[in-house]
Amino acid sequence: MLFGYYYLSMDVSARPSMEYKITRNYAGDRLFSLLAYDKELVTFNDDKIKCYRSVVFSFPERKLLCFSPPSITTLQNFINPRDRKSNCIEPSKYTTNEYIDGLMLNLFFDTRTFRWELAVKYNTGGKQRYRYNKPSSYLAQRYIDIFKQKLQYEGDLMKSPIIKMLSTDHSYSFVCSYRDEKLYLVAVYEINELYARFVEANDYEHWECFANVNGVICFPKRYYFDSCSMEEIEMDVYRHNIDGVVYTSNDDGKRYKVLNYWYNIR
């Protein structure tokens, strides 16, 4: 990846750490190739594979249709405990938002059918793949249904007045919050047949299509921390009583999270 461009290919589908499957669209009349890394097998120092959190290509054309933001790296994992007072980040180079814990859903436009489609990590068509009979899979379907209820009109995404205003050249990544069931737009990517280009939040949050969506689509709360060291950042997160923050690089879109110390124990 260079300067916010993610070049993506089906060629990685044979790697052991990748899950590859053929999925259908909502109407059942088109197929997709979906690539998603298996978090139990992937090595997270492999930046190339980390890009394939959930990527959708047309089948059999192999053209990129949808890109999901790569998994967020926990910044604390890179900090030596003895260096917690040393500078680890330059705030002016990042956009800082509240961390939203929830289910990620990706909205994209299929150029073959001229219809909007919905993808989650392991499936398309607005349905969750039930993996290993885990209860979390059933919970995920609930949040998919919440997404549809908020954006569909008369049961159809294509009739939604909000979606009608969206650029069809982009894919949109939402998180349906586990805490308040609100729908947050967390990432936008310009889609080309070969690559996805990162769009800054400071840009898309001011697009006209999002001017009158209050209460339907939310943006994560913005923070302006001057803190540079891990010790100071963690104190800021604790002081604001939030789950954590996400630092997004303004240059290439790479994301790092800093979680509140009680986040993993509550």
Language model: regions and residue ranges:
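Core nucleotide-handling region used for phosphoryl-transfer chemistry
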Residues: 1-266
